[in-house]
Amino acid sequence: MCYTLGFVTGVLFLLFDRSPFVRFHAVQSTLTFSTITALVILLPVLPGGALLSRVVMAFSIILWAFCIVKASRGEAFKLPIFGDIAEEQLSLNYT
């Protein structure tokens, strides 16, 4: 559920859920999808950035679906970079 609305649900679950598993996914979702959102908004400013922004958006949809499926199955997984940061923030070791 932390991935349902990208970083928005990540923030909500981080605030209201105490489960370490859910909190990890909430932080990971918030970091990942807020970064992607910023890229999609800022990239069109650069030359050729509009196309790159669309590529990032397509990638994010695939990543979003992947995260929803994995988390709904209760699987512990870390995304590169953001999973490590989430783990550090929560002082957990899932993988």
From Swiss-Prot:
Superkingdom as given in the UniProt entry: Archaea
Membrane topology: Multi-pass membrane protein
Keywords: Cell membrane, Membrane, Transmembrane, Transmembrane helix
Transmembrane parts of this sequence: 2-22, 32-52, 55-75
Any one cellular-component term (Gene Ontology): plasma membrane
Subcellular location: Cell membrane
Record-stated family: Belongs to the UPF0132 family.
Entries under PANTHER family matching the protein: UPF0132 DOMAIN PROTEIN (AFU_ORTHOLOGUE AFUA_3G10255) (PTHR36460:SF1)
Protein's name in the database: UPF0132 membrane protein AF_0736
Annotated organism of origin: Archaeoglobus fulgidus (strain ATCC 49558 / DSM 4304 / JCM 9628 / NBRC 100126 / VC-16)
